[in-house]
Swiss-Prot record:
<feature type="transmembrane region" description="Helical">
    <location>
        <begin position="283"/>
        <end position="303"/>
    </location>
</feature>
<dbReference type="GO" id="GO:0005886">
    <property type="term" value="C:plasma membrane"/>
</dbReference>
<feature type="transmembrane region" description="Helical">
    <location>
        <begin position="65"/>
        <end position="85"/>
    </location>
</feature>
<comment type="pathway">
    <text>Cofactor biosynthesis; adenosylcobalamin biosynthesis.</text>
</comment>
<protein>
    <recommendedName>
        <fullName>Cobalamin biosynthesis protein CobD</fullName>
    </recommendedName>
</protein>
<comment type="function">
    <text>Converts cobyric acid to cobinamide by the addition of aminopropanol on the F carboxylic group.</text>
</comment>
<dbReference type="GO" id="GO:0048472">
    <property type="term" value="F:threonine-phosphate decarboxylase activity"/>
</dbReference>
<feature type="transmembrane region" description="Helical">
    <location>
        <begin position="147"/>
        <end position="167"/>
    </location>
</feature>
<keyword id="KW-1133">Transmembrane helix</keyword>
<keyword id="KW-0472">Membrane</keyword>
<keyword id="KW-1003">Cell membrane</keyword>
<comment type="similarity">
    <text>Belongs to the CobD/CbiB family.</text>
</comment>
<keyword id="KW-0812">Transmembrane</keyword>
<dbReference type="GO" id="GO:0015420">
    <property type="term" value="F:ABC-type vitamin B12 transporter activity"/>
</dbReference>
<dbReference type="InterPro" id="IPR004485">
    <property type="entry name" value="Cobalamin_biosynth_CobD/CbiB"/>
</dbReference>
<keyword id="KW-0169">Cobalamin biosynthesis</keyword>
<dbReference type="GO" id="GO:0009236">
    <property type="term" value="P:cobalamin biosynthetic process"/>
</dbReference>
């Protein structure tokens, strides 16, 4: 089966089913990652970088090998590829989590908006005003659109089922271990660096996609001038280009785990509102359409 048809199949499954309501494989993987971290690192953060590399290899490589073997099964390998890509995607989930935030803001129900946005961001949301909630949700849509949708598609297109499994598991470990604190500074180093490497090309393709679908010149200018100021080498281009494309100002100070972080501003334009959350989702969905067209054209060109 062609890569294009496999991607279409996975996107249809995601649209119809969404994330599995019970026993998502990533939940089981998270429990495995917790046990590995407790063994190699512990609450005291005694692990070194080498322990983190070992734990990462034990968590990711056997499952990547399994994905490769499943994709080779006669007759049903194509189905395994579709299912594995579906499990790695989060397009429908992105809307299911972000749209209720926008809807609460349209109703001016700030407590509900705070409660909803707390489900998708790690910052402290208890004191956010409506603008702060809209900013947090819009940032989440732009960044998670890159991580949970476009990067998964990229690695499936490049390396099939093993590629997307390797990427999704690596991204999950970065979310669990990639903190810059006493416990994970050394142990989580490998998970963070590998995720940065795997996201480097997809993030820049996403930034180009956002720019082409929005205010292109402003998006490219924001990417060039603002992204280098952001602390993440991949989130910076994605969010700066996305904010510029939407004509909104994102970034700025935010509280994480009780500490105030002075973040630079990203984008240019108006203050974030409920409509910007919806426009960010539109940007992601339109971007998926563009990628499908490029994939279809590429398949036809090299058929």
């Amino acid at each position: 089966m062609s890569v294009f048809l496999s991607v279409i199949g996975a996107l249809l499954l995601d649209a119809l089913l969404g994330e599995p309501k019970r026993a998502h494989p990533l939940v089981a993987f998270g429990r495995l990652a917790d046990r590995l971290e407790q063994h190699f690192n512990g609450a005291a953060g005694r692990g070194w970088r080498s322990h983190g590399v070992t734990a990462w290899c034990l968590a990711v490589l056997p499952l990547t090998l399994l994905a490769w073997l499943l994709s080779l099964l006669p007759g049903i390998g194509w189905l395994a590829e579709i299912v594995l890509l579906y499990l790695a995607l989060g397009l429908r989930s992105l809307g299911e989590h972000a749209l209720p935030v926008a809807q609460a803001l349209w109703r001016h129900d700030l407590p509900e908006a705070r409660r909803r946005v707390a489900c998708i961001v790690s910052r402290d949301t208890s004191q956010l005003d409506e603008e702060g909630v809209a900013r947090a949700a819009t940032e989440s849509v732009l960044e998670n659109g890159s991580d949970a949708v476009f990067a998964a598609l990229f690695w499936f297109i490049v390396a099939g089922a093993p590629g997307v499994v390797l990427y999704r598991l690596s991204n999950t470990l970065d979310a669990m271990w990639g903190y810059r604190n006493a416990r994970f500074e050394r142990f989580g180093w490998a998970a963070a660096r590998i995720d940065d490497l795997l996201n480097y090309v997809p993030a820049r393709l996403v930034a180009v996609t956002y720019a082409l679908l929005g205010r292109t010149r402003r998006a490219l200018r924001c990417w060039r001038t603002q992204a280098p100021l952001w602390d993440s080498p991949n989130a910076g281009p994605v969010m700066a280009a996305g904010a510029g494309a939407l004509g909104v100002v994102l970034g700025g100070a935010a509280i994480y785990h009780g500490e105030l972080h002075a973040r630079p501003e990203l984008g240019r334009g108006s203050a974030p509102q409920a409509r910007h959350i919806e426009h960010a989702l539109d940007l992601v969905w339109a971007g998926v359409g563009v990628w499908l067209l490029v994939l279809l054209f590429g398949g036809w060109l090299y058929a």
